UniProtKB/Swiss-Prot annotation:
Chain segments carrying region G5: 671-673
GO molecular function, one term: GTPase activity
Record's protein name: Translation initiation factor IF-2
Organism: Synechococcus sp. (strain ATCC 27144 / PCC 6301 / SAUG 1402/1) (Anacystis nidulans)
Main function: One of the essential components for the initiation of protein synthesis. Protects formylmethionyl-tRNA from spontaneous hydrolysis and promotes its binding to the 30S ribosomal subunits. Also involved in the hydrolysis of GTP during the formation of the 70S ribosomal complex.
Region (G3): 581-584
Keyword set, alphabetical order: Cytoplasm, GTP-binding, Initiation factor, Nucleotide-binding, Protein biosynthesis
Length: 1030
């Protein structure tokens, strides 16, 4: 007060009020504030005190009304609309209109919806009248409230709050006050009384939203006039004072407004009062209405009448609540009434009566039926007892009784049906009990919980429970790795053995059937060149074909299977040989396996200067699995460092003994570049062919294998097919794997179109519906209908297998949960892979599986042959994937779309580089780790005391010392101190670093216990890129 400023909480403390009461008054007076710690000026404090004392603040209110005259006029209109009848009683009170408008401004701003309903019901004068009474009441109440300051402010403050929330709250109060003095003065007619009640009711209904506890204070201290204003508020809150009359008035408005509307002819006001009333009863509930009648006795006659009106609507509310439990009773009475109706109906119609009697008999029979178990009888008796006890209260809903009675017979009949089902169930159980739990199961790879349960003859829930106790939350469709399966199987006493995977080179289908025996003819051999990368396979085939295919291969390595036809002259006859050139890179294992499976003779190419390498051993295993004869071509014999004998020696270790050493393997030293011994190699191939007696039936429908497939931008799906039996012609309907197609054109290895392809003939086929998988077998069908059926069934099988593979990718192992808990969420690298041919896609996917994926998992969202399209870009943008292209191109618009979406598109033509970049990207997702990098070693040779500390005179023995680097001080074998090198000087000058062989002074802020001979190790922490852990 001395400084001219007072904080709101200080004023409330001085007046012994709550902060919220003072804030409500500030809202009413439009005094700006942020919180209860805001300050008020002296003028504002005077205004607040006047309001709390019960007097209308004349100066501030007048100023507000003058400043905001347009707004006040608007509110006057709204208020007048509210009350039509009361205004007639108090038409001449326009003097104080300005003041109420100022206080009502906030109210009108907040609830715009409440204001409109008041307008229609009121006239121009009533608007002013309601506003006037609000202030006169306060002035009249001043003397009463002045003595007890604390309660009075509460009463006034709370009304202020109510206007802030809903606009109607402020207007109703003045209306009640204005009308109260008028009826007391002279009006004795019953109509005016009704008008008073209706007016009071709108006040309370509008004030219903106002704070409840604040109004309780008003009734206690103020006279009868005040309690009426505060009554609506008290009704909302829990009122302890003995003035329930106020709440009663609040409840009464619903019934009275209706009467007032009918009597006065103003339906609008009544309709608006009704919507406001339902809001109040919902909040306080029924109990509040009960409490109000008790204090109603001391109230005046008018109040008693109001209370009586209020209580009439209340009882229906109480009855509605208990009706819910009374529902069960209704069916009881309804059942009895139904029996009476049925008896009457039986007398009139004999047929109907007989039918109903039968039904009743059935019900009785069911009750007495021996099939009912003791538990069912008890349950039925309990249900009847409950129905009896609950049936007494009400009888309105008769139809519900029928379903209740009908349920009883159904329960009785169920046992009979269940008996038949029980028999069926028993039979099923007997059948299911036949399979015995195996003692040993064999596994090839991971499998789902459902598959494991079927294999072990164990309920799926038991397996899931077992996994749960191991800390693995698995579902029925989740895939388990072999280690987890072994542990689960051990719990059930079942041994697990892993099957050796069958080689992909094994020939699973016999192309020549018994029916072809009569039409067999000799066919050209299919020769596959296999061996390690860069050992000269393609160069050797070029030498045989006298072409230069290797020069066109990216990186000089073969990345597809190439099929070539070569005409060779032997003993004066022309012989045809089909060569398949397989990739030697480790990623192309599947291609080499396919090449071995379709081949008749395998040529193992080994470099004389390199010897046996990993892919050489793999090629040997493929040839043995395919059970095909093997010819070894020792290439690069023209080099100085060539050692053919050493190569022969290495091959003997793997069961390939040369003929000259007494074995059965043909070995020919050749030089692909110089063309040495090429004729000898071809002669050996033809000799082996004669021994093998290769035959086929060219007169039947073609069968064979898909060597390679890709999607051509112009020609669509293109597949390289090797016909192994029969003849393939243009127009034939064929199924390759799950792909249906009709041969539209065939092109040989030289680019010439052909009309028919005989056995051992490799051609490119156009006209397939989709790109088949490399390695799939194809067969020609006579009609398209049967071919389509086969293709559809295979497509369904492939879809199911893909789903299982997708589930397997979310592999669950015993270490998964703990690893994810330690590392956080498992990081993933999303890829979209597009390659030129299907074989390349397989090779890349196989190589990606070999990458360590403990910390970062590779998710291939799409892997398909063909060019990179805008659809691929959209998928990558939505999933945050990187598009990897291998020997492919971008479709028109794909590059622009990728630039706009910010998608990373990488194109490769060498698989080495592709795999290296993907591994680098996986490592880039890992958080870098801090690694200690040693800088040097420093020896302390002297100690100088400076003030309270000491400086070490040192000599840099090795490396260097850098200011602010990390150091360790060692004394003998003990670590004395670890910290940071704070000060580094040379010749009394600060330096950043001192190199080896120089002296320097070192000072530390937190260490000074130097001794001569101490060794200081200098190092720094650097971030190092983490590598993938195997």
């Amino acid at each position: 007060m001395n400084n001219g400023k007072v904080r709101i909480y200080e004023l409330s403390k001085e007046l012994n009020l709550d902060n919220k009461d003072v804030l409500a008054v500030c809202d009413r007076l439009e005094i700006p504030y942020k919180s209860y710690s805001s300050t008020l000026s002296e003028e504002q404090v005077v205004q607040v005190r006047q309001v709390l004392a019960g007097a209308a603040p004349s100066e501030p209110v007048a100023a507000a009304s003058a400043a905001d005259s347009p707004k006040a006029e608007r509110k006057q209109e709204i208020v007048s609309v509210r009350r039509p009848t009361p205004q007639a009683a108090g038409g001449a009170k326009p003097e104080i209109v300005g003041r109420p408008t100022a206080s009502e401004k906030p109210q009108a701003e907040r609830p715009n919806i409440v204001a409109p309903p008041r307008r229609p019901a009121a006239a121009n004068e009533p608007a002013k009248a309601p506003i006037k009474p609000a202030r006169p009441e306060k002035s009249a109440e001043k003397p009463e409230i002045v003595t007890p300051r604390p309660p009075a402010p509460a009463a006034s403050a709370e009304p202020a709050k109510s206007p802030s929330r809903p606009a109607p709250a402020a207007t109703p109060r003045p209306v009640a006050e204005t009308k109260k003095p008028k009826p007391a003065a002279a009006e004795l007619l019953r109509k005016p009384e009704i008008v008073r009640r209706s007016e009071a009711k709108p006040e309370r209904t509008s004030e219903a939203p106002t704070p409840r506890p604040k109004i309780e204070r008003r009734p206690e201290q103020t006279g009868p006039a005040r309690p009426q204003l505060g009554q609506p508020v008290a009704g909302n809150g829990v009122s302890k004072p003995a003035k329930p009359v106020k709440p009663i008035e609040l409840v009464a408005p619903p019934s009275r407004p209706k009467v007032a509307a009918s009597a006065s002819g103003v339906p609008a006001a009544a309709s608006r009062v009704l919507p406001n009333k339902p809001q109040k009863p919902t909040a306080p509930g029924g109990p509040e209405l009960k409490q109000r009648p008790k204090p109603a006795a001391p109230a005046s006659g008018e109040d008693l009448a109001a209370t009586v009106d209020v209580f009439q609507p209340v009882p229906p509310l109480e009855l509605r609540r208990p009706t819910a439990p009374a529902r069960p009773a209704r069916p009881r009475k309804g059942w009895e009434e139904e029996e009476d109706e049925r008896a009457a109906a039986n007398r009139k119609a004999g047929n109907k009566a007989a039918a109903k009697a039968k039904r009743r008999q059935l019900i009785q029979d069911d009750d007495d039926d021996d099939l009912l178990t003791a538990e069912q009888e008890l349950a039925a008796a309990d249900a009847l007892n409950l129905a009896m006890s609950l049936a007494r209260p009400s009888k309105p809903k008769v139809p519900q009784a029928k379903p209740a009675v009908a349920v009883m017979p159904t329960k009785g009949r169920k046992p009979r049906r269940e008996s038949a089902r029980e028999r069926q169930h028993r039979r099923r159980m007997e059948r299911e009990q036949k399979p015995v739990r195996p003692e040993l199961i064999s596994l090839r790879s991971s499998m789902t919980v459902q598959e494991l349960a079927q294999l072990m003859v164990v309920p799926e829930t038991d397996i899931i429970k077992s996994l749960f106790f191991k800390g693995i939350a698995a579902t029925v469709t989740q895939s388990l790795d072999v280690a987890t399966i072994e542990q689960v199987a051990e719990e059930f006493g079942i041994l697990v053995e892993q099957e050796t995977e069958e080689s992909g080179a094994r020939k699973t289908t016999q192309m020549v059937e018994d029916a072809d025996a009569e039409s067999l003819q000799t066919l050209p051999p299919v020769v596959t060149a296999m061996g390690h990368v860069d050992h000269g396979k393609t160069t050797l085939l070029d030498a045989i074909r006298k072409t230069r295919v290797a020069a066109g291969e990216a990186g000089g390595i073969t990345q597809h299977i190439g099929a070539y036809h070569v005409d060779v002259e032997h003993n004066g006859d022309q012989h045809q040989i089909v060569f398949l050139d397989t990739p030697g890179h480790e990623a192309f294992t599947a291609m080499r396996a396919r090449g071995a499976r379709v081949t008749d003779i395998a040529i193992l190419v080994v470099a004389a200067d390199d010897g046996v390498r990993p892919q050489t051993l793999e090629a040997i295993s493929h040839a043995k699995a395919a059970e095909v004869p093997l010819i070894v071509a020792i290439n690069k014999c023209d080099k100085e460092e060539a050692q053919p004998d050493r190569v022969k020696q290495e091959l003997t270790e793997y069961g390939l003994v040369p003929e000259e050493w007494g074995g059965e393997t043909v070995m020919v030293p050749v030089s692909a570049i110089k063309g040495e011994n090429i004729d000898q190699l071809l002669e050996m191939i033809l000799l082996v062919t004669e021994v093998e007696e290769l035959v086929a039936n060219p007169d039947r429908a073609a069968r064979g294998t898909v060597i390679e497939a890709h999607l051509d931008k112009a020609r669509g799906p293109v597949a390289t097919l090797l016909v192994q039996n029969g003849t393939l012609r243009v127009g034939d309907v064929l199924v390759a794997g799950s792909v249906l197609g009709k041969v539209r054109a065939m092109v040989d290895d030289r680019g010439d179109r052909v009309e028919a392809a005989t056995p051992s003939f490799a051609v490119e086929v156009l006209g397939l519906g989709d790109v088949p998988a490399a390695g799939d077998e194809f067969e020609v069908y006579s009609d398209e209908k049967s071919a389509r059926a086969v293709a559809t069934s295979r497509a369904d099988e492939q879809r199911q297998s893909r789903l299982q593979q997708a589930m397997a990718s979310r592999r669950v192992s015993l270490g998964t949960v703990s690893a994810q808990a330690q590392e956080g969420e498992l990081k993933e690298l999303n890829l979209i892979l597009k390659a030129d041919v299907q074989g390349s896609v397989e090779a890349i996917l196989g190589s990606l599986e070999q990458l360590p994926q403990k910390q970062v998992q590779v998710r291939v969202l799409l892997a398909a042959p063909g060019e990179i399209t805008e659809t691929d870009v959209d998928l990558a943008a939505a999933s945050g994937a990187v598009i990897v292209g291998f020997n492919t191109t971008l479709a028109s618009g794909a590059k622009r779309a990728a630039d706009e979406a910010g998608v990373d598109v990488r194109d490769y033509d060498i698989i080495y580089k592709l795999l290296e970049d993907i591994q680098a990207a996986m490592e880039g997702l890992l958080e870098p780790e801090l690694v200690e990098e040693p800088l040097g070693q420093v020896e302390v040779r002297a100690v100088f005391s400076i003030g309270r500390g000491a400086v070490a005179g040192c000599y840099v023995q090795s490396g260097k010392a850098i200011r602010n680097c990390n150091i360790r001080v060692r004394r003998g074998s003990n670590l004395v101190y670890t910290g940071t090198l704070d000060s580094l000087k040379r010749m009394k000058e600060d330096v950043k670093e001192v190199n080896s062989g120089y002296e320097c002074g070192i000072g530390l802020d937190s260490f000074s216990a130097w001794q001569e001979g101490d060794i200081i190790e200098t190092y720094r922490m650097v971030t190092k890129r983490r590598t993938l852990e195997v």
